[in-house]
């Protein structure tokens, strides 16, 4: 699981490197690192470590990007499109922070086994902490990708670099005191910045303790006055963590949610339910008769028509749409009437609207600056209700009901959509995600290098040759 999670992490990071905000952050990092560099050699590009990045009006040649800045960039970029994995206990995102921190501190001799062992340790700690503090932590408005992620990053770095005892305790302590991230940033660039800051602060804590004589508390999780008591007003003992450690493992149970589209994972069940409803409605006898076309013989033919017919939209037929959740299950979907595509990534209304208008989610619509009034009018016909039974923190279920103007009703319930732990992405799905940035032959070379290199740095060199990892 750790291996496919790393490829998925790269598949989320790579397309984000073409986004303006990500390139702007690269230029900001470049400005810090380019004193004495040849600025302006490529007037329409940024150059980092000798690699040209398209876009912009200036050139910043960075010869030595600090580990701290690498972590910031990787974390921000890999979470920017909200295309990265999520985990239910954490109620946040593992890989964006952990892999970003680990890549930043990587040494040329680090092996895959060491790299993935460190990731698993960081993920395990984050998942257990999430289990202990959620759902209260989430409902209070914290973004655990930031608040817990920095602790996981420190744990992963400590594992990779072989820290233990007092040294590890001080590293975790310095990370814990930097815990931050609030969910009001969702739908803005502030949310992916949480991931970048968590990775950066984990690396910074490690660097500070390695290169100075500073001393910190060695008991950051003291049951009476430590992190858990301060953040969540709960008492947690070392046994509460030890008794759950790798039993069976947070990557196994509850596992990871991975995405085929760049929007909040809380909407995945609803999106797939809407797609099933669309297919059922489109192939219904009443719809076929009314619109005077032959019903497709296969699902492939159906999907082909949905994706290629400009006037496919069902909205002229629809009276109302109801999205059914268990109580509180839509907390992360904070926008009921989004005004931008970015906000729409956290709106079940916008996502269901797309499916009913186009037959499937349209990724490019999450990049628009302003959502049209007619789209918002359609979204006003979508309502949320909370009439499904309450489920555990690790479960998700959503029902979508579409009522037509003629009174016909279509409904579907989904609890294990594509990308969920019980219906995981395959390697072919990961190749498709990589294909958003790379050509088929490039993907082949990346997978070949990933499979046959012993040291992580050798693989990263292949990635950079193929145009991934601009820092």
Annotate each predicted stretch with a short phrase.
Residues 98-105, 122-126, 150-158, 202-209, ...:
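Buried hydrophobic packing segments
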Residues 3, 7, 98, 116-119, ...:
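Hydrophobic face of alpha-helices
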Residues 95-96, 146-151, 426-430:
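Short acidic alpha-helix initiation/capping motifs at coil-to-helix transition points
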Residues 1-91, 190, 194-200, 207, ...:
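Terminal-appendage/accessory-domain detector
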Residues 72-111, 125:
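Function-dense linear segments that define catalytic or interfacial modules
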Residues 67, 92-96, 116, 120:
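Alpha-helix N-cap/helix-start motif at coil-to-helix transitions, marked by capping-box chemistry
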